[in-house]
Structures are given as structure tokens and as C-alpha cells.
Amino acid sequence: MKTISTYPMNHQSDICIDVTLMIEFDTKPVLNQKGFIRIYDYDTDELVDELDLSIPSGPTAPRKNPEAKYTTGYQYKSENITNKNTKAGSLSMEYRSSPDPYQLTIIGGFKEGFHFYPVIIKDDRAMIQLHHNLLEYGHKYYVLIDKEVFDGFDGIDYKDGFCFSTKKERPIGNRFVVDKNHGDFYTVQGAIDNIPDFSDVKYFVDIKNGEYEELVYFRNKRNIVITGESKDGVLIHYANNEVFNPHPEYVKTNEKVGTFPSRRAAFFMDNCHGIVMRDLTVKTDLHGQAEGLLVNGYDNCFENIHIIGSGDALQTNGPAYYRNCIIDGEGDTILGRGPAFFENTTLNSKGAFMWIRNGKENHGNVFVNCMFNGLDDDATIVRLPDNKGISYPDSECVLINCTLNHVPDIGYGPIEGDSKKARLWEYGSKDIHGNEIDVIHRNTVARILKDEDRDIIEKYMDYHYVLGDDFKMSL
């Protein structure tokens, strides 16, 4: 097997510090579970990073977890936690945890770490993901790769076989470009890592068209506008789910504000306020409990984005606004505590469109002029199951002037537990031909609003009523 090219090219300069390395072969390479990939400082020969390919990337089967608390608190401090100064897998709080025998990297300051794929094979190319935040500006590095890493590979065992130099200085200003070829950063994560926590200054991240196979996680960010060059041209995706990156054994996640965060999404913003995302696609490549996008925070706005997930394709916690979006999922397609306001958005779901978990302190999910497209016979609008003795009696879902396609006549269900206070309200629903839907067979828990309920309808058409008078619209 012959090496055709590398990225960076040998002795190439002006490389982003968040670069993903690439080797192109003359045939599709076979990755072995042995050998090392090592990165050294060219001038000092100091080891900078090491990937041990004998370590599996992450779990491939579900783990049976003991009963755990949902409400374990989590401290969102602004700390400079990276792979350079902290061992991935360190505990940020006191809880029992078994040793982690998988690949781990710290992303976005999450010291517990994420399982990741150090090498991803794409056709005849091997994409090599280093541990995050280890390369520095103004340095030259060389790469050594054991011949055992790939079948039929001669290896790279000398200093000038694969070397490159990073950009001389960190980009300045408040606007950064993500681009594989000529950007300030190679990855979305790299650009966001460059933005300080809790900033009052507005920052802009512009993403050029391309495929970005990366797990994105950031926390404590404020006032960032993330814009893709085009919705269909920018794809940010990763193979992640609850199996591959499960919550700790004795902790459950995201049940209340300030509790331990999940690690199973492809793109996750955590304790973030005033974030705008537009004109891009986020996607998880795995099935199961697997969010394409997971949002924790306040005053976050999304426009013209495509979210592709499996179960829980979108988890949305805290006041958030969605306009002209597409959300594809495989059941409980929208999960979370809310409140969330959706306008002119299309939902495609193989199972129930949502499982709402809001409490009485805030609204749930409200949809105005949206499209619900059921992809199988079980695509009810909402289900409210009993979750091991836990239910959400104040759940709220309101549909106003929405189009429903292949949604069961019952509309809502299964509904378990106390539902007397649930608000499952609907007004003006029509089919794809514009005809009024016959709602005579709707679940008795649901309420069909009439024209005489105009005051209620007008309130729910106002995002401020749903998200709060202090919600800051950024679109």
C-alpha cells in the first residue's frame, strides 16, 4: 500500500492548530488495533501527543447502570481545562466511577472527557484526530506512525517524513472563519475554543461549505453567532450516542437546570446564552439515544438549520427559538424541559414527535405554522410515558395552524400517569392539501381550541409569552 499524499503536506506551513491529519493511500486502508501515532516538537523532539491504537474508541454495547440520582449538581466554572494540563477522565465532582478503558479526549473543558475515534477511514484516506488543544502557534511538528497501524503500511519513522508548521499567531478580532483550506480554524470546535467564556463582546464564527466530522461541545459561552455558508453545504456530524459516550454510572443527566450534562450529542452547547446558529446542518451518525443538537441555556436562537438525529434528535432546555428549521428523528424527536418556540419548522419522525418534560415553572413546546410529517404509524404528536415512576404532569404542547401528515387520528399518546394539568392544545390543524383535519378521535387529554379561544391563541403565537418577557431575540 503506497502513500499518495498527506495533509498537511510535508514541510507545509501556516497550518491551523486544530488540524485533523490525513494520509491518502492508493487503496482503502485497513486500520489495525495496534501501534502508535506520535507527534513531536520538531525543534526539541519533545513528545506532544500519542495515540495508542490498541485502545478501543468507545463502548459498542449498552451498559447496565445502577439506579442513580437525576439531580446531581454540576459546577459551571470558567476554567482552562485542556488535555495539556488535565488528564481526560478526571472527575469534576464526587461520584463513583469505574475505570474507563477507552480513548478519551477533553473537549470544551469537560474534564470527564469524551470517547472519540483517533482514526477514521474515509474511502482511501485515513483521518487522524489528535487529542484536542495540544498543538501551539508558531511551532513545527513531525509525525511518526508505526507500520502496524495499517495493513501493508511501511510506516513513517523519520523526522522529515511528515512534518508541518502551525500558524505563527492566534487570530485576533471577533470574527473567525472555519475552513479546511484557508480558515482561521480547521474545526468548529477550534474556533469556539478561541472565544472567552462569559464574554459581553459579540463573536462571529463563519463556517465555509464542507464536511466537518467532529464532536462539538462548548460551555459557558455568550453572544456568539455561528453561521454556515449554506444549510445544505455545511455538514457538522459525528458518530455519537448514549452507548458510545454514556453518562457516568451513578449520575443521570440534564433533568434539571445545573445538573450533570449529557455527552451523547453530535453538537452540544451547554450553559450557553445568546447563541445564534443559522444556515448549516448538524447530524449524529449513530442510532439510539442520539441528539444531533443538544441545547442547555437561555436566549438561544436557531434559523434555517437542519437537525438530524435518532431518538431525541433535538434536546432543548431553556428558552430557545427555532425558525425555518428541519428536524429529523426516530422517536421522541424533540426532548427537553423547554420552553421552546418553533415557527415555520418541519419535523419528520418515525415515532412520537416529542416527549415534553417541562415543569410548571415554564411553558413547554409551541409550534406555529409548522409541518409534522409522520414516517410510520406510531408518529403521535406527543407521548407522556411513566419513566420508572417519574412523570411530567405539567407538560405543555401547543400547535397553532400546523400541517399534519400521516399522524394517527388519536394524535397524542400513550399518556400515562396524572395528566389533568397537561396542556396538549391544538388549533387550526390541516392536512397537506390544506383541508381541516377531523379531530373527533383525538385523545381525550387533548383540547381542541376554537375561534372563541382567540385570546389564548394570540398569546401562544407570541414568542415572548412562551419564552418569557425577558427573552432576547437575536434573529
What is each of the regions a protein language model found here?
Residues 168-475:
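Sequence-level preference for short, compositionally simple segments enriched
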Residues 2-170:
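Acidic, low-complexity Ser/Thr/Gly/Pro-rich repeat segments typical of extracellular/periplasmic
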